[in-house]
Amino acid sequence: MKVEFDIIDNHALSFEGHHIDLHNNFDFVGYDYNKAERQIKMNWKKSSGDWVRKYEFSSLILKHSAVTFLKVIDQDQIGNGEESGCLGEISFFPSSEREVNDQLLPQSRPNEGDDIIYFFESGQCIRIHCEKIELIIYKD
């Protein structure tokens, strides 16, 4: 898997000198899956909290290309609606261990054959295997 970023502290991305805190400064809007093109776009928008820097990107997309695996584990039945868009953690994890969906590894870059797993505060988990992840950023 080729990626354009490093994962920092399992909740943020480092990209071209920018620290992008997906847990605190961005809300997950949803994902678009184009099965024919084997592409998944994970969509994020800047949080409205007063702690978010004014010069933070307005939104971003993590575009997964040549997807060969997708697993979505639904959120908890008693999830808090406010938490549904909040990323808990993000991790690369070996695709050989797909039965394990509740652990993370503190690695900044993927190893050969890794999946990427997005853990949300709501209990939802999205696991993807692809050839490339591109980070697309938008400014106001």
Give the ranges of each region predicted by the language model.
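Surface-exposed, interaction-prone regions used to assemble/regulate multi-protein complexes
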Residues: M1-D140
